[in-house]
Amino acid sequence: MGLNWQYNDKDFTDDLIGDNYGFVYQITNLANNKKYIGKKFFYSTKTKQVKGKKKKLKVPSDWQTYYGSSDTLKQDVLQYGPENFKREILHLCKSKGVCGYLEAKEQFTNNVLESDDYYNTWIMVRVRKSHIKDYNARSVP
């Protein structure tokens, strides 16, 4: 089950990325129903020396094989196997700021720090109003 990311109950693949920057996700351990909410970007920026000048390059991330940053979650993936985890995309995001905002919003809404039902152990976000100026809450599922 957990081998592919799901978005609206369908497999999410490279060709569906479009102009999105990243996504907010939830990973569920099907053996004990414990969950993790996080964010992941489709690309990262690397700098490379080209003819004596620094050039920024957009490099694909490891989003297809990613299982979160929680060490406990990663240990459980090794113990139970990836097929016992459901990886679902909750929100596709057009910018880094919107990803950070929606991740924190989901984490606070679900009380991830107050519940033993979540792997999350901390919430870290730095978002300014200007980062989400183009975000329209009504257009996000």
Outline where the language-model segments fall.
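Structure-specific nucleic-acid interaction/processing domains
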Residues: 1-141
